[in-house]
Amino acid sequence: MSADNHQVPIEIRGLTKHFGSVRALDGLDLTVREGEVHGFLGPNGAGKSTTLRILLGLVKADGGSVRLLGGDPWTDAVDLHRHIAYVPGDVTLWPSLTGGETIDLLARMRGGIDNARRAELIERFGLDPTKKARTYSKGNRQKVSLISALSSHATLLLLDEPSSGLDPLMENVFQQCIGEARQRGVTVLLSSHILAETEALCEKVTIIRAGKTVESGSLDALRHLSRTSIKAEMIGDPGDLSQIKGVEDISIEGTTVRAQVDSESLRELIQVLGHAGVRSLVSQPPTLEELFLRHYSLGPEVAAEQQVATP
């Protein structure tokens, strides 16, 4: 096992995992290259957290192959954990330790800490490190975990819904920090069900559904997934909106217009509606669940499977 010479920090092929009769992973493939911020996307229950638990050596796979920093996450867990940092979506801390003590303890498990970066991150995230962990809100517990991971010497970050509990200002700080980590050459696997967060941070994306990889590639190659829902209350007649390229699923009921529009055509559609006269207009990016329903035709069997599968 080598953690020093690896062009592919994460290499997963045909990964399977069952929990009783529930199939959590069903032949999953995932490749994350060195220095990459890689989005790992899927609706809740798709198998993202199970995959991360296998990478962390907390769960043993039933089948397939997994290489993490050149090693086996199940048999080489102790050595590998000196080079990786993990941030879960719901952080649990030692209640009697202060935030600062917890940051240092976690970082020591990861091969040490950059004290200057630690101090900078505490200030940027607005954390009081002298308070006991038992007094922290969910957002502050999340900050402790993020600060420890980002100030450590880890070469690989495994992030499972890491911005959960952060307010919009702190989420912006988090995104800046991930960009800085990438500039330092750190590899990041970001598990999320939020498409916008992934678009802001990641250059590559792997999308999974029901424990299988359904798409993987650059964000530019996956732009067809990103459509915005439009609902407008009209004053005038907008005309034939189907003539606008990238506008689909158009429905008109009385004065209410609904449509789906590609990001490249959104501005043109809004201009056309505005010229016709609009009382109100609401635009909403699609949820991942909507994207999967639209692009991958989720059937009731798969939907039910996702409800019971380990996330």
From Swiss-Prot:
Function statement: Probably part of the ABC transporter complex Rv1217c-Rv1218c involved in the resistance to a wide range of structurally unrelated drugs. Could be involved in the efflux of substrates belonging to the diverse chemical classes of novobiocins, biarylpiperazines, pyridines, bisanilinopyrimidines, pyrroles and, to a smaller extent, pyrazolones. Probably responsible for energy coupling to the transport system.
Cellular component GO terms held in the UniProt record: plasma membrane
Top EC class for this record: translocase
A biological process term (GO) from this entry: response to antibiotic
Quaternary structure and interacting proteins, as annotated: The complex is probably composed of two ATP-binding proteins (Rv1218c) and a transmembrane protein (Rv1217c).
Intrachain S-S bonds: none
Topology versus the membrane: Peripheral membrane protein
Annotated positions binding ATP: 42-49
Keyword Oxidoreductase among UniProt keywords: no
Subcellular location: Cell inner membrane
Induction: Transcriptionally regulated by RaaS (Rv1219c). Expression increases in multidrug-resistant clinical strains (MDR-TB) compared to drug-susceptible strains.
Protein's name in the database: Multidrug efflux system ATP-binding protein Rv1218c
Pfam families, A to Z: ABC_tran, DrrA1-3_C
